Amino acid sequence: MIVLTGASGGIGLEIIEELSKLDDVLAIYNTSKPKDVALKNVSFHKVDISDPDEIKNFIDQESSNLKDVTLINLAAVSIDGLLANYGIEDWEKVMSINLSSNFLFSRYLIPIMIKDKWGRIIHVSSTNSAIGAGAYSSSKSGLEGLSKALSREYARYNITSNIIKLGVFDTGMFHKLSDKNKKTFLDLVPSKKLGKTSNILNAIDFLINSEFVNGASITIDGGSS
């Protein structure tokens, strides 16, 4: 069973169909349910992932259906602005969705993984450290410590925790950028090409099937970082 957060985002929507070919998918969205997506092995669930109680209640409700779980923490949010201008509410929102939700989903799914003697935790991060994205970058840096801790504490149960760090990809989010910003991002990539969702799926498939890759961070950005 694959548990995917961020199912309504650009990358989430584009990888769901291929993920459903690997296993059944519990696709979690935070705001609006994706339209025109009907796949045999995918069920969509609305969960406010900034609310610890909602996450716990969701896992409790689905626990009887969960076995051999791969958790893919994809959900993320960014609020642009210089750090000195950030309100505490904005900071806490970014941290709760980008970092705390990863901890909470891991925390509540690990007992199931321990029982199964198998589990995969994949945190999706980013190489973005642009000016004006300080809270986003800080939250994603926090994933490094979280993933390392999980990898060391639960390896003996055949549970792995790894990070995939993404560069610029050919998704709806990229195409919403201005032509100037598109060029800025593309100029960072030596090949001048956008990443494809198949690159992400290859990494996910690799991590699901690799029991000795643990605590690692895999960068998929075409050499831009």
What are the roles of these predicted feature ranges?
Residues 8, 16:
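N-terminal Rossmann NAD(P)H-binding glycine-rich loop of SDR-like oxidoreductase domains
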Residues 74-80, 223:
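Conserved NAD(P)H cofactor-binding loop of Rossmann-fold oxidoreductase domains
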Residues 82-83, 90-95, 174, 185:
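Substrate-binding pocket helix/loop in short-chain dehydrogenase/reductase
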Residues 106, 139-142, 147:
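Active-site helix of classical SDR
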Residues 111, 152-156:
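Alpha-helical segment proximal to the catalytic Tyr-Lys
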Residues 155-160, 213-216:
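Short, small/polar-rich loop/turn modules that mediate ligand/substrate recognition or access, typified
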Residues 193-220:
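C-terminal substrate-recognition "lid" of short-chain dehydrogenase/reductases
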